[in-house]
Amino acid sequence: MQIVLASQSPSRRKILNSAGVEPLIHPADVDEDALLHSLNGSAPEEIVRQLALAKAQVVAPSYPGDVVIGGDSMLLIDATLQGKPHTREATIERWKQQRGNKATLITGHAIIFGDEVIVESSSTNIHFAEASDVDIERYADSGEPLECAGAFTLEALGGWFIDSIEGDPSSVIGLSLPVVRRALYRLGFNASDFWNM
């Protein structure tokens, strides 16, 4: 038995690796734009939970004897939910909006084992630094934030521009170890059952 990560996120994989788990990586093929459109008007937490669930549900049938984890993160700032910026220009625009402000990073988790499905979200408050225009442009030029929810990373270059967080650091990086641990316990497993030791 193993953990299957329904994600191509290197950050989610690194979180599990640093916690002693070498997951099988099986990225989910989900039309996120269509799903987001269908969820229009839903609460932010529900949106990220449903995105995570869709990813896990696509992958789970291929691994009936394994624990499948789907995840998704989005940044809630000024009552607007933001995903990945994808472009340099969008990254710069977002950083000019979020610098010096507080936002909430919401990470949805879906953990599936057989017929059992556990869906939960985790929210962490982020206090962004007053980053300079030059640093914002250079950060965007690095390419690092283009495919990250909220246009930032906590564990790499983006860490320079985060003053503080309130909540679970692993959730900000992309996968809450406390949420996954609680789900494993509910499924009758120990976290250590999946350690590669």
Curated annotation (Swiss-Prot):
InterPro entries: ITPase-like_fam (IPR029001), Maf-like (IPR003697). It is found in: Cytoplasm. Its cofactor is a divalent metal cation. GO terms for biological process: nucleotide metabolic process. Its EC number is 3.6.1.9. It comes from the Bacteria. The keyword Cell inner membrane does not apply. It catalyses: a ribonucleoside 5'-triphosphate + H2O = a ribonucleoside 5'-phosphate + diphosphate + H(+); a 2'-deoxyribonucleoside 5'-triphosphate + H2O = a 2'-deoxyribonucleoside 5'-phosphate + diphosphate + H(+). One of its GO terms (molecular function) is nucleoside triphosphate diphosphatase activity. Keywords: Cytoplasm, Hydrolase, Nucleotide metabolism. GO terms for cellular component: cytoplasm. Pfam families: Maf. The active site is at D72. HAMAP family: Maf (MF_00528). Belongs to the Maf family. Nucleoside triphosphate pyrophosphatase. May have a dual role in cell division arrest and in preventing the incorporation of modified nucleotides into cellular nucleic acids. This is Nucleoside triphosphate pyrophosphatase.
